[in-house]
Amino acid sequence: MKVLIVLLLGLAFVLADHHHHHHDYVVKTHEDLTNYRTQCVEKVHASEELVEKYKKWQYPDDAVTHCYLECIFQKFGFYDTEHGFDVHKIHIQLAGPGVEVHESDEVHQKIAHCAETHSKEGDSCSKAYHAGMCFMNSNLQLVQHSVKV
């Protein structure tokens, strides 16, 4: 009986720690976005013309912009080339600090749909761009509000 209790407690700690991992995400601010934009523009060598479009939330379908958005999503901490998007972290960013998010929520489902639909795109930059655009095209105001534009 003691062994069973120890095993159950161990399982509870593992599950609690796994769930806690998502609570480690810190919601980013408009200042963070501005810093990330500067860093990513430099990384991908975006032209002044493209930079002006990005500031207006316009993202043309070209290789530079694809990699720019990949960089932005990586800086936010919810995309990596090996695992793709972390849907839960994106949802936390959109919901804002202190708001509990649930997988059954409509927004969560939309994020997951876009991430899954575009997970098989060619290169990592294309995956990030097309999945990001999928979500932004239907939820731009929510995205903008999440960084207090």
UniProtKB/Swiss-Prot annotation:
Disulfide bridge map: 40-71, 67-125, 114-134
Cell location: Secreted
CDD domains (alphabetical): PBP_GOBP
GO biological process, one term: sensory perception of chemical stimulus
Tissue distribution: Expressed in adult olfactory system. Expressed in subsets of sensilla in both olfactory organs, the maxillary palps, and third antennal segments.
Effect in UniProt of substituting residue 82 to D: In strain: 10A, 100A, 101A, 149A, 158A, 189A, 195A, 223A, 233A, 237A, 28A, 303A, 312A, 319A, 324A, 325A, 32A, 335A, 340A, 348A, 350A, 352A, 356A, 358A, 359A, 360A, 362A, 365A, 367A, 371A, 380A, 383A, 386A, 387A, 390A, 393A, 398A, 40A, 405A, 41A, 443A, 486A, 514A, 517A, 528A, 554A, 59A, 627A, 639A, 672A, 703A, 707A, 712A, 730A, 739A, 761A, 762A, 767A, 770A, 786A, 788A, 793A, 804A, 820A, 833A, 834A, 836A, 849A, 850A, 851A, 852A, 853A and 855A
InterPro entries found in the cross-reference section: PBP/GOBP, PBP_GOBP_sf
Keyword Nucleotidyltransferase tagged: no
Name of a matching Pfam family: PBP_GOBP
Mutagenesis / variant outcome for changing residue 19 to P: In strain: 405A
A GO CC annotation given for this chain: extracellular region
A GO molecular function held by the record: odorant binding
Membrane among keywords: no
Residues spanning the signal sequence: 1-16
Keywords for this protein: Disulfide bond, Olfaction, Secreted, Sensory transduction, Signal, Transport
Family of the protein in this entry: Belongs to the PBP/GOBP family.
Function: Present in the aqueous fluid surrounding olfactory sensory dendrites and are thought to aid in the capture and transport of hydrophobic odorants into and through this fluid.
Protein name: General odorant-binding protein 99b
Organism: Drosophila melanogaster
Taxonomy of the source species: Eukaryota, Metazoa, Ecdysozoa, Arthropoda, Hexapoda
